[in-house]
Amino acid sequence: MKLESLYEYIVLAHYLNFTTAASNLHTSQPNLSKHISELEQELGVTLLRREKRLELTAAGTAFLE
């Protein structure tokens, strides 16, 4: 697990918007999305509900805490 991915997840959880979080992290939205997907695969859980609006799942909230 990369420390960078953990930090990116914290920022994304704060903004709940990939574009805004990516901009604040000085990276691209596709790159951020890839890192979060890799983190989810590594943990074996879904951290975010990607529907009309981005939301943390119960596992995502627990992981953030």
Task: Annotate each PLM feature.
Residues 2-8, 29, 60:
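The N-cap/first-turn positions of alpha helices
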Residues 10-26, 53:
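Short helix-boundary/capping micro-motifs
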Residues 15, 24, 37-46:
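Residue cluster at the C-terminal edge of the helix-turn-helix DNA-binding motif
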Residues 40-58:
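A short LG(V/I)-centered, amphipathic sequence patch enriched
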Residues 59-65:
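Short, solvent-exposed amphipathic helices
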